[in-house]
């Protein structure tokens, strides 16, 4: 497209719907549903639910970032891009990269380690309780202190889970900043 040419109302609406839908989904999964489920479900049931939700969630995030990049990238000749347009493309590329890392690499590894942890926990009669309902010493801490294999698996799980959380927060922040930029560019409400 030539500099300054309007991409059309439909493209603008699709871009806004995909971007805001992705961001809303990310806010829900990151800050609301996970905490509600964690406090309401037995530990292993929570893990099972998350292992089913996260692959879909990460792939939808990846798809939304890809769609938005495909919409935005061809809108202007690259030489005519403003600083904001370059920033927005960079943020969407970052979101696509982080969502891809989560969807294609981290999620499968995190789930595999979680299943190995749950197998050991089941052998010890753990995993059917809702977190935070312990009376007395924490049985998971005791298991971690007594079983080096379990302790190593927990470290590995938290490593993958931490990286996945950072990638997810990066996607959320990238999409949020893109939405802020779009909102600041509105002429009226």
Curated annotation (Swiss-Prot):
Classify the main location. membrane
Keyword Transmembrane attributed: yes
Transmembrane among the record's keywords?
A: yes
Membrane-crossing ranges are 18-38, 53-73, 81-101, 166-186
Q: How does it sit in the membrane?
A: Multi-pass membrane protein
* UniProt keywords, alphabetically: Membrane, Transmembrane, Transmembrane helix
Superkingdom is Eukaryota
Do you know which InterPro entries this protein is assigned to?
TMEM205, TMEM205-like
Q: What is this protein called?
A: Transmembrane protein 205
GO CC annotation terms, alphabetical: membrane
Q: Give the location in the cell.
A: Membrane
Question: What family does the Swiss-Prot or TrEMBL record give for this protein?
Answer: Belongs to the TMEM205 family.
The disulfide bonds in this chain are none
């Amino acid at each position: 497209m030539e500099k300054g040419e309007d991409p059309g109302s439909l493209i603008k609406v699709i871009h806004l719907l995909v971007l805001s839908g992705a961001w809303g989904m990310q806010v829900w999964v990151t800050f609301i549903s996970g905490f509600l489920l964690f406090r309401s479900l037995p530990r292993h049931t929570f893990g099972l639910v998350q292992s089913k939700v996260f692959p879909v969630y990460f792939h939808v995030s990846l798809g939304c970032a890809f769609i938005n990049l495909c919409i935005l990238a061809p809108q202007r000749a690259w030489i005519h891009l403003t600083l904001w347009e370059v920033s927005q493309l960079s943020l969407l590329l970052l979101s696509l990269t982080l969502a891809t890392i989560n969807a294609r690499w981290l999620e499968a590894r995190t789930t595999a380690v979680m299943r190995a942890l749950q197998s050991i926990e089941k052998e010890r009669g753990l995993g059917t309780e809702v977190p935070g309902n312990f009376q007395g010493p924490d049985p998971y801490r005791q298991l971690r202190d007594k079983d080096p294999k379990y302790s190593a698996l927990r470290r590995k799980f938290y490593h993958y889970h931490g990286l996945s959380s950072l990638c997810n927060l990066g996607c959320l922040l990238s999409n949020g900043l893109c939405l802020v930029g779009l909102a600041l560019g509105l002429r009226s409400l």
